[in-house]
Amino acid sequence: TFVTTEEGVEIGFQDYFVRLSHNVVVTDIRFGGIESAKPSEGILEQIHLASSVIIAPSNPIVSIGPILAVPGIREALQDRRGDVTAISGIVGGKALKGPADRLLQELGYESSVAGVARLYSDISSRLVIDEVDKDERERVEQEGVECVVTNTIMESSDLAAILCRTVLGLGS
């Protein structure tokens, strides 16, 4: 993954994240070699066979984005959209960790649960959001995505287990 800074310089994501402490403005993202990337053997079949698919609460641009950019993955998820649930990693307009909120804003996306819903609306029929964002339910649903409100901040293994049970119980 490569980022282009506001100075027009393209650097590797690790350089941006570690050496520069993600403290520069990003104007573009490029996934090097993505045109020749292929899904791992059997992954497309597994997406089609799975009873549900869960998109973790990770950075939609640099963590989930490269996966969706692999030829065939986004299309497979679109085919299964009704069985796909995403969990928002943006809570109260901020990333719980890392530069996701800044990257979203710098690249012209909204750093909010509605922004995440918009990014995933073609591949996910459901978005799980934190209770902090419960007032955003209607905006999420305006993106054509069912909104599920629960505690998504996994501060303990007990809270993580509750979130897991909630998400696994959706769509069944």
Task: Give a label for each model feature.
Residues 27-47:
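Active-site glycine-rich loop that binds ribose-phosphate moieties when present
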Residues 1-31:
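Electropositive, gly/pro-rich neighborhoods at or near active sites that engage anionic ligands
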Residues 80-97, 152-154:
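Short, flexible loop segments at boundaries between secondary-structure elements
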Residues 75-81, 121-122:
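Short, conserved loop/helix-junction motifs that constitute active-site signature segments
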Residues 51-54, 83, 126:
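Structural motif
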Residues 58-62, 90-92, 133:
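Short glycine-rich anion-binding loops that position phosphate/pyrophosphate groups of nucleotides
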Residues 67-74:
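Charged helix-capping and loop-helix junction motifs
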Residues 97-172:
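C-terminal functional extensions of proteins
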